[in-house]
């Protein structure tokens, strides 16, 4: 099992973790229905980029 040779400071730990923050979800408004949905995803009524792609 690996064991560190030297203790890492709080500063080094914080610098390593600086890229771990989560960003908010990117939302778009559908042109046909006006529904808010996640980017690059089909809306609940089956539209994607203004075209009907799923028939329910």
UniProtKB/Swiss-Prot annotation:
Residues 1-36 are annotated as: Disordered. Keywords: Ribonucleoprotein, Ribosomal protein. GO terms for molecular function: structural constituent of ribosome. GO terms for cellular component: cytosolic large ribosomal subunit. Residues 7-16 have a biased composition (Basic residues). Residues 21-31 have a biased composition (Polar residues). GO terms for biological process: translation. PANTHER family: 50S RIBOSOMAL PROTEIN L32, LARGE RIBOSOMAL SUBUNIT PROTEIN BL32. Belongs to the bacterial ribosomal protein bL32 family. This is Large ribosomal subunit protein bL32. The gene is rpmF.
